[in-house]
Amino acid sequence: MQITIREPGSAITHFIAMMMAVFATVPLLVKAGIQSGWENFLAMAIFMGSMILLYGASATYHSVDLTGRSLRIFRKLDHMMIFVLIAGSYTPVCLIVLGGKLGYTLLALVWGIAAVGMLVKACWITCPKWFSSVIYIAMGWVCVLVFGPLLKTLSVPAFLWLLSGGIIYT
């Protein structure tokens, strides 16, 4: 029996990324739970879970040799998980770095945008790429709303890492 992988490069690299996230999750959660308590544990679990979901959905979408409705479902999941990863990446920043009312407000805003984005992808997977890109980028840069508090709370290197990540993803 011959197995056909639709897009081997993407399938393999995304599978490797998913497995790396899976293997990194346990030690990170143990460290977060022991050193920092439940809120850090939860934030890290959501972040790592979002990474596993994104790379798992993407590896599956690029692997399966399907057509028609089945392929369309996997494509929707692949695209929807981008919103989950962006929101999942915000979760530790909101819960750990910002905390309090500001952190929870930003968290609700980001996950709200993610929910709308996932709904758009579920209902309109053929939307123009520019439309999706605008939502992804806007969601990624919503942190400028809390630029001041982030700058006060984070060390300069941590802030520069956060800023660099935003620039690279944009």
Which residues does each PLM region occupy?
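Multi-pass alpha-helical transmembrane bundles in non-GPCR membrane proteins
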Residues: M1-T170
